């Protein structure tokens, strides 16, 4: 069916208005499992650590309002977003770089700071990438494409980054620390991370990925953005894909010293953040309920899910994110496939932990669907 732009705007505007009329903005929407042709009718999608409650009503309204300026490049709107981010993070405008999701930030970091080590009249370029194992794999891919050496350091017994061993493994280049970590949802304690950043060599960039920052409530966790001005080799990545519910819009950012930002900007495409993403991100930052309610709903449903798994005899790594990782007591690859055949999509295999399953925390009805399917499967084929 073909619809005009006017009709499309009317439909989206009606949806935003309906959302705004509901209590607690978008995060108080129905908790039923989705049955939408755009996502797959009846598919319970618990595989990508998305926010099932979606963007805030203010973000939806801002997107609708931005339709008439879709003919314009996003420079002014992007600058307005950077201004807000700089103020929120107590840094200068030139210390923020927007990205097409935080994924673009990770790629830029790999492009600039990793690769075969070469020395010319401008100095030494390239370097190795040091990461925890397991962790989010995207930056490993980018570094390998660049021809860089990738050094994997296993997580410690608490599923935190083993920072002492990572420090020993450092070679000029880049260290990537995802905190809270994906896929384990675990944190690296704040004092250990502060000490690591202070000890890291000047010729090595420390990239801390704080995609799941808003979900972390442990007293042993803190953002390292306040340390950026003290450490020229520190950069921090953030995203609007998680608690802000904008995974499909693609908007993220980096906080670092201005000299680092300029090196990244040289490799970046112009206007990589579209105008809808920019206005929606700015509106999201002005909606305190989005974060507050998102954290509350995630915490409630996560606690329910962990308790049910514990009742079944499956132990979960303590989670500080919008997903969990638990010991399935058997190889997860067959479980992933069998769950998919029952319309439940869970996280992929992480080879360093072949018996552990990563599971996004969806709405309660979605988690009940997962638990029902999982109970049936493990009853048929016990470990």
Enumerate the predicted regions with their spans:
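N-terminal export signals
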Residues: 1-28
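C-terminal segment of N-terminal export signals and the immediately downstream linker at the start
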Residues: 22-71, 270
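Phosphate-binding glycine-rich loop
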Residues: 80-128, 146
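PLP-dependent aminotransferase-like
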Residues: 115-177
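Active-site pre-lysine segment of PLP-dependent enzymes
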Residues: 144, 162-171, 183-206, 210-243
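Conserved PLP-binding catalytic core of the aspartate aminotransferase-like
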Residues: 155-157, 299, 308-342
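PLP-dependent aminotransferase class I/II
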Residues: 233-317
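PLP-dependent enzyme catalytic core of the Aspartate aminotransferase-like
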Residues: 338-342, 350-383
């Amino acid at each position: 069916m073909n619809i005009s732009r006017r009709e499309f705007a009317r439909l989206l505007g009606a949806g935003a208005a309906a959302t705004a009329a509901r209590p607690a903005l978008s995060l108080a929407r129905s908790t039923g499992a989705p049955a939408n042709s755009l996502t797959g009718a009846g598919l319970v999608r618990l595989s990508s650590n998305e926010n099932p409650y979606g963007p805030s009503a203010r973000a939806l309204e801002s997107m609708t309002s931005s339709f008439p300026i879709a003919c314009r490049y996003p420079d002014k709107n992007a600058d307005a977003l950077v201004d807000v981010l700089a103020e929120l993070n107590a840094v200068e405008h030139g210390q923020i770089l927007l990205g097409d999701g935080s994924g673009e930030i990770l790629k830029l970091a790999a492009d600039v700071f990793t690769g075969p080590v070469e020395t010319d009249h401008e100095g030494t370029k390239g370097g190795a990438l040091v990461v925890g194992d397991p962790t989010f794999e995207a930056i490993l891919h980018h570094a390998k494409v660049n021809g860089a050496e990738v050094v994997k350091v296993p997580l410690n017994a608490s599923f935190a980054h083993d920072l002492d061993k990572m420090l020993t493994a450092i070679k000029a280049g880049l260290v990537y620390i995802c905190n809270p970590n994906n896929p384990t949802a675990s944190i690296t304690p704040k004092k250990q991370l502060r000490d690591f950043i202070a000890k890291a060599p000047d010729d090595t960039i420390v990239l801390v990925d704080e995609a799941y920052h808003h979900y972390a409530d442990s007293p042993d966790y803190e953002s390292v953005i306040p340390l950026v001005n003290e450490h020229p080799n520190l950069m921090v990545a953030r995203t609007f894909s998680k608690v802000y519910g904008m995974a499909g819009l693609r908007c993220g950012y980096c906080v670092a010293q201005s000299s680092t930002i300029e090196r990244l900007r040289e490799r970046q495409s112009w206007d990589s953040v579209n105008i809808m993403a920019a206005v929606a991100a700015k509106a999201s930052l002005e909606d305190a309920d989005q974060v507050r309610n998102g954290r509350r709903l995630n915490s409630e449903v996560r606690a329910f899910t962990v308790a049910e798994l514990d009742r079944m005899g499956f132990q979960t790594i303590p989670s500080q994110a919008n997903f969990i990782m638990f010991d399935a007591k058997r190889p997860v690859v067959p479980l992933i496939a069998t769950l998919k055949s029952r319309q439940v999509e869970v996280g992929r295999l992480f080879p360093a932990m072949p018996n552990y399953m990563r599971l996004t925390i969806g709405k309660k009805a979605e988690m009940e669907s997962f638990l029902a399917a999982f109970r049936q499967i493990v009853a048929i084929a016990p470990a």
